[in-house]
Amino acid sequence: MSELTTIARPYAKAVFDFAVEQSEKDKSAVEKWTNMLEFLSELIRHDKVQSYLTSTSSTFKLADTVILICGEQLDQYGQNLVRLMAENKRLAVLPAVFNEFKSYVEEYKSLSQVEVVSAQQLNDVQQQKIITAMEKRLARKVILNCRIDSSLIAGAIIRTNDFVIDGSCRGQINRLANELRL
């Protein structure tokens, strides 16, 4: 586990718990927090903002500047989060907070991100078969993220948090090579 994740997790958990609590009154609260954190994460990743974070020593000035840039993207609670994280000199951790927050939301909504790396573009039927199989195996709704890696030669690699299924030709060749070395 990286240091950023260790620092980000308590912030993400607190924001998530607050968003769930808010969702009793406002059904879109979790979605609003997702949007706010995503916006903050993208803002903090920007090169000019990164250099500003390291050059500014006043936490109040830093927080006020970030809040000013965000404008209507942040509600009062989002602004409070920015102030708190600026005070603790943790604004640079916001992208990791967003990633951790997304993990909590996925767990809450019984979602799993599944990455499929294939040698060629998968058509809709192939993608649907993978989604169906993974939903059955994981017993939860699946969000498929596909990308192409021609070095696989053929087949695909399917990854989720818990496991990897390597059905690629490259993987089979590597396993065969390892067996032959014995």
Curated annotation (Swiss-Prot):
UniProt-recorded Gene Ontology molecular function terms: proton-transporting ATP synthase activity, rotational mechanism
InterPro entries hit by this protein: ATP_synth_OSCP/delta_N_sf (IPR026015), ATPase_OSCP/d_CS (IPR020781), ATPase_OSCP/dsu (IPR000711)
Keyword field contains GTP-binding: no
Protein name per UniProt: ATP synthase subunit delta
Binding partners and assembly: F-type ATPases have 2 components, F(1) - the catalytic core - and F(0) - the membrane proton channel. F(1) has five subunits: alpha(3), beta(3), gamma(1), delta(1), epsilon(1). F(0) has three main subunits: a(1), b(2) and c(10-14). The alpha and beta chains form an alternating ring which encloses part of the gamma chain. F(1) is attached to F(0) by a central stalk formed by the gamma and epsilon chains, while a peripheral stalk is formed by the delta and b chains.
GO CC terms in record: plasma membrane; proton-transporting ATP synthase complex
Protein task: F(1)F(0) ATP synthase produces ATP from ADP in the presence of a proton or sodium gradient. F-type ATPases consist of two structural domains, F(1) containing the extramembraneous catalytic core and F(0) containing the membrane proton channel, linked together by a central stalk and a peripheral stalk. During catalysis, ATP synthesis in the catalytic domain of F(1) is coupled via a rotary mechanism of the central stalk subunits to proton translocation.
SUPFAM superfamilies per UniProt: N-terminal domain of the delta subunit of the F1F0-ATP synthase
Pfam family, one: OSCP
Species: Histophilus somni (strain 2336) (Haemophilus somnus)
Family annotation (HAMAP family): ATP_synth_delta_bact
Family affiliation: Belongs to the ATPase delta chain family.
Compartments, as annotated in UniProt: Cell inner membrane
Swiss-Prot/TrEMBL keywords: ATP synthesis, Cell inner membrane, Cell membrane, CF(1), Hydrogen ion transport, Ion transport, Membrane, Transport
Predominant place of localization: membrane
Mode of membrane association: Peripheral membrane protein
